[in-house]
């Protein structure tokens, strides 16, 4: 229950909000690049945030706000490509679950002064921007993560990650779909207010 899934524009930014409906979640656009997401109930999967559509390799993305997860959650630059269908994450912070623990480690890269582990994994018959599909996920996971539980801010040089992925044979699709700073929750609870620039 809560805010129904939707996409659109607000304050000059693209937003995407998706929930499987199992958890109790409220997503609110605050104007500009800001959004607030509150979720509870420790069930279901949800992801929402603001950014751009289409995404771009050359973008430098800054974010600031508060991120207070309880349980499994990510705060990341999150997006999709088509041709090939790829879901990607540049994870800045996360809750109780390290997303790199369930993926295949490919290497590491230093971007914006921080080290990120690079991973990939396949998703089978899973939700995507094109309905239920089988597709690859690309991950950069900041190690160590930025501390959750309060104020958080940072800048992500997207090109740095995309180039590192390409150097490891991880090729994104040729057509970019959305690219947002997303808060994701899985069978957890929490709150986040994030402003993207």
From Swiss-Prot:
Keyword annotations for this protein?
Carbohydrate metabolism, Disulfide bond, Glycosidase, Hydrolase, Polysaccharide degradation, Secreted, Xylan degradation
Q: Per the database record, which ranges form the GH11 domain?
A: 1-197
| Superkingdom per UniProt | Eukaryota
Gene Ontology cellular component list = extracellular region
Catalytic EC class = hydrolase
| SUPFAM superfamilies attached to this UniProt entry | Concanavalin A-like lectins/glucanases
Function recorded in the entry: Hydrolyzes xylans into xylobiose and xylose.
The text of the family note is: Belongs to the glycosyl hydrolase 11 (cellulase G) family.
What's this protein's name? Endo-1,4-beta-xylanase A
Which species does this protein come from?
Answer: Schizophyllum commune (Split gill fungus)
Task: Report the gene name.
Answer: XYNA
